[in-house]
Design a protein with these regions (language model features):
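C-terminal segment of classical bacterial N-terminal signal peptides
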Residues: 17-25
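Soluble extracellular-acting proteins and domains
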Residues: 28-153
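Extended, helix-rich scaffolding/adaptor regions
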Residues: 3-4, 25-27
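Hydrophobic helical h-region of N-terminal Sec-dependent signal peptides
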Residues: 12-14
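Bacterial N-terminal signal peptides that target proteins for export
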Residues: 1-10
């Protein structure tokens, strides 16, 4: 069974739906995002979250290894390396997406807790699924948004 997507991306002025759930063009917030390495290096620019915030408080993740559940946001932003689990790589992308969506100065295309994007639900669903293919799709979409032009540089 294929998972339904709730994530969409904005490219230029046209909305591109990734995975099938469309929203009116007026609902898209903007084509900006900052990558994980930006957020790791500029912790003073974080809004609504702190470096010691735990990833386990942001997403339902009982099926993850204990070491991953105990990561702080700052730790999750570290490059996990080529041998990292898919879930660990997802946590890095997810933390960056939350920091982008929370920042008033970033016109990020996804929202954390509201329609039509529901980052929290999309990320929690991917983690809970245990399906590495599904997690990779979410990682790809989050990374695409996280690597849009960063207005905070």
């Amino acid at each position: 069974m294929r998972h339904r997507y709730r994530i969409a991306a904005v490219v230029g002025t046209a909305a591109t739906v990734l995975g099938g759930l469309a929203a009116p063009a007026s609902a898209y917030y903007g084509p900006e995002g900052c990558p994980p390495q930006y957020w790791r290096a500029h912790q003073g620019n974080w809004q609504e979250y702190r470096p010691d915030s735990r990833v386990s408080n942001a997403w339902h993740m009982t099926n993850l290894p204990l070491a991953e559940r105990q990561l702080t946001f700052a730790q999750a932003l570290a490059d996990p390396g080529r041998t990292a689990t898919t879930s660990r790589t997802l946590l890095r992308s997810a933390v960056a997406s939350y920091l982008n969506a929370a920042h008033e100065g970033v016109l990020y295309p996804y929202r954390r807790f509201s329609a039509p994007y529901y980052l929290r639900i999309s990320i929690s669903d991917a983690i809970a699924s245990g399906d590495t293919g599904y997690m990779r799709e979410v990682i790809r979409d989050l990374d695409r948004a996280n690597n849009l032009p960063c207005p905070l540089h």
